[in-house]
Amino acid sequence: MRPVSGDPPTDPSSERPLRAGDWVEVRSLAEIRATLDGEGRRNGFLFMPEMVPFCGRRFQVSKRAEKTCYGSRFLRVGGAVHLAGARCNGSAHDGCELQCLTFWREEWLRRVDGPQEVGNRPAAAPVGRSAGGGSAVATGRPAALPTRVDSPGDGTVFICQATALRDVTREPVGAWNPRPYFHEIHVGNAGWAEAKQLIRWSLAWGRLRVFKAFSRQQSTPKAPRERIDVGDWVEVRSAPEILATLTKFGKNRGLRLSEDMLTFCGERFRVERSVTRFIDETTGRMKVMQSPCLVLESATCRGFNILCPRAQFHFWRPEWLRRLDGSSGAPPPDSPAGKPPPRT
């Protein structure tokens, strides 16, 4: 494991670490490259080709990256933030469709007063193929931004920020340890309103745990499946309806339903896209789904259990959704601008 430095601030112009709501400008590619080691990393955090187009642009900090999920574990990180809307498009990783929220070291950012960009935005360098088979930014430093390792006998293993999380993590975070929750409030990632949502997640966790304990369903049950297309408006079905489609392991055709997903029951969203391929962050292998899943606009993991800020998109089976009548085109009248109805 690579050494991890202490939590910054690392921008000498800042008087405190960046917090949610702060505005920043991503430094130029040349400035960022000057902070990277020979593997294109800074303290374990990988800078990817997909992040190059963000150079010179301004974003609002969505959360500090104090902790993260990795596989089935929760781990503490630090010294980085997430930027609102700055997601990986998978273009340098064979079209991975996860659209992960990227991690940004504070050294890669410059604090600014607001969203308005002054002057010309620096041009992004083109992304090309390196001699070793990976992708690299064409800036005169071959393979500076690797994306994969090709082995004749072992196939392709991808390298990205998600697969590299094991190199930046410090120690595991216990879901029942109260200290991380208070820390999230202290750094501005959450308020008491978010902390109260732990009750909502706990109820979903208990319901799913009881289901798994008493279910005897070995294979995926047959369930009505509507045709749902990209652009349709849908409502997440009730917990009993969704649980009726699962095996005793909490899966539907191999896809696991998480406790967090049960907190979306009754809410309405528009279908953003379908997903067929993604990189498994624990192995670096590309997985191709036999049955495509659906992604809903803004339906990302809320991280209620440990207030994780990673905001990964959930994958949904059509059986878990109800298509709203006449849903193509404009949003339903009781779901203005595509937002879910207020929670009660």
Where are these regions (language model features)?
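Basic/aromatic-rich interaction segments and small domains that mediate binding to polyanionic partners
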Residues: 2-20, 29-127, 140-204, 208-230, ...
